[in-house]
């Protein structure tokens, strides 16, 4: 734990995390290729799928990464793990500005860090995880990582939907700054 007092994760567990969520199915467009998704590519996918992100939404990014790990059946291939599935381009200023302007309250993915790890090099920027810095420290936007989104993404796509009710309470860990979540999607 970090001994966080006023902003410990237990504050969220007292009231839960619940609200409207929207699925962005990057995997349906990009497959398992390692692609750094910038603002233009994300907007193109949102437009093609007619997905609208509104203020207060929890945005789920389905990349297929967690499903790929499960398919490795406890024998992960390090090369595949390092070089597969979409990640957000954390150094894209337009993408970071869209996150701010959209009013989203959580950004969730089925990969390790939501953004590319390590981040793309950029002169003048020392943040190892610039999207984390932007979301967590500047905006207070929560990040969810390594969620198994494939069954939900498939159901939503098969039923022509993108929105659902997401309930994702963190564990009650006094003083901690993060926690595993126990998410439930209601469709």
Residues covered by each model-derived region:
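Active-/binding-site microenvironments in catalytic and ligand-binding cores
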Residues: 1-187
């Amino acid at each position: 734990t970090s001994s966080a007092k006023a902003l410990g994760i237990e504050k969220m567990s007292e009231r839960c995390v619940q609200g409207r969520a929207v699925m962005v199915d990057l995997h349906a467009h990009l497959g398992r290729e390692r692609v750094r998704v910038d603002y233009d590519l994300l907007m193109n996918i949102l437009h093609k799928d007619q997905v609208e992100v509104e203020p207060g939404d929890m945005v789920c990014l389905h990349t297929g990464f967690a499903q790929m790990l499960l398919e490795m059946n406890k024998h992960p291939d390090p090369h595949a793990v390092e070089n597969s599935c979409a990640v957000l381009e954390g150094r894209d200023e337009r993408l970071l500005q869209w996150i701010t302007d959209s009013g989203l309250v959580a950004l969730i993915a089925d990969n390790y860090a939501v953004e590319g790890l390590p981040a793309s090099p950029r002169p003048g920027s020392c943040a190892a995880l610039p999207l984390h810095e932007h979301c967590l420290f500047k905006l207070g936007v929560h990040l969810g990582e390594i969620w198994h989104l494939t069954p939900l993404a498939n159901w939503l796509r098969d039923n022509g939907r993108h929105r659902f009710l997401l309930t994702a309470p963190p564990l009650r860990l006094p003083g901690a700054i993060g926690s595993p979540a126990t998410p439930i999607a209601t469709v």
